[in-house]
């Protein structure tokens, strides 16, 4: 039942996945759509990241709180999800009483890329915003920026 996806490097993009060593970096991907989740995980694994997933904001919050401090290095958070949406989950993570709750980068992933959506993501405590469908080049840029 897997989805095979082929990726092409854009012409002129001479960066390759081996540019930066992300081994040991752990990412939590929060996405309720199975196909979008699989695509995101494939992209992130191509870059050498260790990935875990959650199907909604409530599960993401539960995983974050159950993990030791500093366990996750980055969170990619879908916005529109059942049970608890991405905005609610980001606010709940930021409100947690542990040191990594304030500093972990949370990146909104959504099909809505309007400026109002970006503002709402930032207001909810997210650090940045990336639109679906993913472009590997943009994903690499965001990861480089937040996993320095």
Predicted features along the sequence, with ranges:
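Active-site beta3 strand of CheY-like receiver
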Residues: 70-76
